[in-house]
Amino acid sequence: MKKVLASATILSLMLVGCSNGGNDESSHKDDSSKTEQKDKSSSQHDSKKDSKRNDTNNKQDNQENNTNKEQTNNQNPNDGEQRTSERPTTNSNGNSSDNQNKQQQSVQDNQNKYVAPYQSENATRVARCLSPFEGDRSQALQQLPNFETALSIAKNEANMYGSENKSYNDYSIEQTEDGFRYVFSFKDPSKSNTYSIVTLNRQGQPTVVDPNFQP
């Protein structure tokens, strides 16, 4: 009888052990499946985070590219304006330099061609009698056009009245309210003892005072 009870006790203990072992295995399986699900969820969550990060980075890159393009576009028009504005300036400076060089050359030519004022050979005192000048002749001449130029202009003006072949006779200087002026006399070959009187101011403007003057 004791043997039977002992065998029954051992059998029941074995059954209990098997039962516990089965429960442990099923519990371990449940834990494993839960862990796998957590790992999957975590990996999915991480992948979503990575995707969001990539999207954010792409947006930032696009924004930076757009900003750089805008800055480049904003700078280029300014460069164009500067280049455009520089060209006319260079041209105007070049033209100005050319004009200055021409003016200087003209002044040098006039100085090289300078001829001191003179009376014609065997001149009659006509202009000198009309306008005797007792002032500083050199100072007056500095304010007047070149003598040869003034004489040529005055002669052309005199030839517009009467004979066109008048000859130079004499000159004088006359003081005016605004400075000085030349006084020229030109002999008319077609009339006896007749002269044309022409004045020329500082600006080089001639005026026929008397086309038929007889001293």
From Swiss-Prot:
Stretch forming the signal peptide: 1-17
Gene Ontology cellular-component terms listed: plasma membrane
Residue ranges crossing the lipid bilayer per the database entry: none
Domain of life: Bacteria
PROSITE patterns: PROKAR_LIPOPROTEIN
Lipidation (N-palmitoyl cysteine): 18
Bilayer topology annotation: Lipid-anchor
Location relative to the cell: Cell membrane
Keywords associated with the record: Cell membrane, Lipoprotein, Membrane, Palmitate, Signal
Residue segments, region Disordered: 17-110
Record's compositionally biased regions (Basic and acidic residues): 25-62
Low complexity composition-biased segments: 63-76, 91-110
Principal location class: membrane
Keyword Nucleus recorded: no
Record flagged with keyword Membrane: yes
Lipidation (S-diacylglycerol cysteine): 18
Protein name: Uncharacterized lipoprotein SERP1959
Organism: Staphylococcus epidermidis (strain ATCC 35984 / DSM 28319 / BCRC 17069 / CCUG 31568 / BM 3577 / RP62A)
Organism classification: Bacteria, Bacillati, Bacillota, Bacilli, Bacillales
